[in-house]
Amino acid sequence: MLSFLSSNLSSTRQSLAQVLNFALVLSTAFMLWKGLSVFTASSSPIVVVLSGSMEPAFQRGDLLFLWNRSPRAELGEIVVYNVRGKDIPIVHRVVRTFPEVEGKAKKVKEITGTSSIPPNMLLTKGDNNVADDTELYAKNQDFLHREEDIVGSVRGYMPMVGYVTIMLSEHPWLKTVLLGIMGLMVILQREQ
């Protein structure tokens, strides 16, 4: 009877240790993500290219690393932005900037009482697209505001690494298969 209680207590401890290890892995991943977000000043410091609109620069499935600490976006820079009201990151190149001229700064000072310059305004386009992105922007929006709409500027990439996330979102049954394989591995590992 005592050996039964001892083995039962031991298996409970092992189960609890596995749960705590899993929680540790999840919390570590979350903290790394948040730390990277703070370091890059981007809400999403890593994104996956979802379409072929930026070919040949980036292919579908490429993993992009973003940086959002620059106060202005330059002509030709590749940026990631979210359309207002939608949470789909779009990766396109800045094809036109609307720099604030001195007259605008004076007008802003007259209206607001401060001489702060309005945000950098941008027009973007995919390298593989015929037209600019004005049709993709929110209703009544003709350009992007650097501070409001831009998630970050592309600073690096890893080819095809993000294709796994595309496959998992396009084929939901793959998630089930993957979870089943991981569960089977946990069960088999426990028996040893």
UniProtKB/Swiss-Prot annotation:
Active-site residue list: 53 (charge relay system), 92 (charge relay system), 133 (charge relay system)
Location of the protein in the cell: Endoplasmic reticulum membrane
Membrane topology note: Single-pass type II membrane protein
Record-annotated membrane-spanning stretches: 19-39
Region (C-terminal short (CTS) helix): 177-188
Residue ranges annotated as Cytoplasmic topological domain: 1-18
The keyword Transmembrane is assigned to this record: yes
Domain of life: Eukaryota
Lumenal topological intervals: 40-192
Catalytic activity, EC: 3.4.21.89
GO CC annotations, alphabetized: signal peptidase complex
GO biological process: protein targeting to ER; signal peptide processing
GO molecular-function term, one example from the UniProt record: serine-type endopeptidase activity
Record field: catalytic activity: Cleavage of hydrophobic, N-terminal signal or leader sequences from secreted and periplasmic proteins
Keywords, alphabetical: Endoplasmic reticulum, Hydrolase, Membrane, Protease, Signal-anchor, Transmembrane, Transmembrane helix
Family, similarity comment: Belongs to the peptidase S26B family.
Subunit structure: Component of the signal peptidase complex (SPC) composed of a catalytic subunit SEC11 and three accessory subunits SPC1, SPC2 and SPC3. The complex induces a local thinning of the ER membrane which is used to measure the length of the signal peptide (SP) h-region of protein substrates. This ensures the selectivity of the complex towards h-regions shorter than 18-20 amino acids. SPC associates with the translocon complex.
Role this protein plays: Catalytic component of the signal peptidase complex (SPC) which catalyzes the cleavage of N-terminal signal sequences from nascent proteins as they are translocated into the lumen of the endoplasmic reticulum. Specifically cleaves N-terminal signal peptides that contain a hydrophobic alpha-helix (h-region) shorter than 18-20 amino acids.
Comment on protein domains: The C-terminal short (CTS) helix is essential for catalytic activity. It may be accommodated as a transmembrane helix in the thinned membrane environment of the complex, similarly to the signal peptide in the complex substrates.
Protein name (database record): Signal peptidase complex catalytic subunit sec11
Native organism: Aspergillus clavatus (strain ATCC 1007 / CBS 513.65 / DSM 816 / NCTC 3887 / NRRL 1 / QM 1276 / 107)
Record gene name: sec11
